[in-house]
Amino acid sequence: MKELSSWKIQNLQPYILLVPAVSILTIFLLVPLIWNIYLSLHDVSFTNILKDWNYVGIKNFSEILSDPNFHTSLKVTLLFVSGSIALQFFVGMVLAVLLSQHVRGTNTLRAIFIIPWIVSAVITGFSFKFIFNEDFGVLNYGLEQMGLSPVSWLSDPETVVWTIVIANMWHGTPFTMLFLTAGLFSINPIVYEAATIDGATKIRSFFHITLPLLKPFILINLILITMWSVNFFDLILVMTNGGPLFSSTTASLYMYREAFEFGLLSKGSVIGIFLLAINMILAYSYIKLFKRRENVIESR
C-alpha cells in the first residue's frame, strides 16, 4: 500500500504543481471570457445595468456585422496592424543584428534602445502628438525651416494612420530588437565559422543560417506583436481619439468607446469576441505558414 501511495503521489505531483497556474488562468482568463460571452447574448448597457437583462441571442452579433462603423474600424485595424508589424519587425531585426555584434558599447546601446518600450504608451502618445502637431509641432517646424510646407499629420485622414504607425513602431520596436537579439545569441558561433570557411558571405550566412535558426523566435515575436497591435488602443486614444472622421478608429478603440464611453456593454462584448477570433486566426495562420515552409525546406 505504501508503494502504491508513493507511486500515486509521484505521478500526481506535476498536476498538483500546475494547480496554482491553472487557477490563476481560470480566474483571469476563462471567467472573464465566459462573462463576456454572456454579456454579448443579452441587452446590457449603463442604463439597465441594475435591472433584469433581456436575452437577445445573436441579435447583437448581427447588428455589429451590419454596422458600417465596425467595417471601417476593421479596415483601419488592417492598415495599422500590417504597417506596425512590417516596420517593427524590419527595424527590430536590423537593430538586433547590429547590436548583437561583439563590439564595445553595444550593451549600453541596447539599454538605451529598450527605453521606448518601457515608457508608457500614453506618454509615448502625448510625445508624438506634440511632435506631429500641425501648428507648433517639432516636425513641421523643421520642415518650415527647410522651406517646405507643414503637413497635417494628425488631421488628414490620408496620413493619420501612418503617423500612428510610426509612433507605435517607436514604442514597440525595442521588444522585437530584444527578443531577436536573444535568438541571435542562442546561435552557436561555430556555425558561422564553418560557413565562412566554406566561402559563405555575410549575406548568405544571414539568409541561410541566421533566419532559419531564428524561426522559433520570429514566429513567437510575430504572434505577440500582431496580437498587441490588434488590441492596441491607448496610444491612438491619446493621439487622435479615433479622428478625424473615424479615420483612425481601430476595432479595439471602437470596442472601448462603445462599451465605456457610450455604455453599450453588449456591443463592446461582441466586438471583443470578434477581436479574440481575429487574434486566434492570425496566430493559427502564422503557425501553419511556418510549418508549411519548414516542410518545403525539408522536402528539398
Task: Give residue spans per PLM region.
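N-terminal hydrophobic targeting signals that begin at the initiator methionine
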Residues: M1-L4
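A structural signal for multi-pass alpha-helical bundles of membrane permease subunits
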Residues: S6-R300
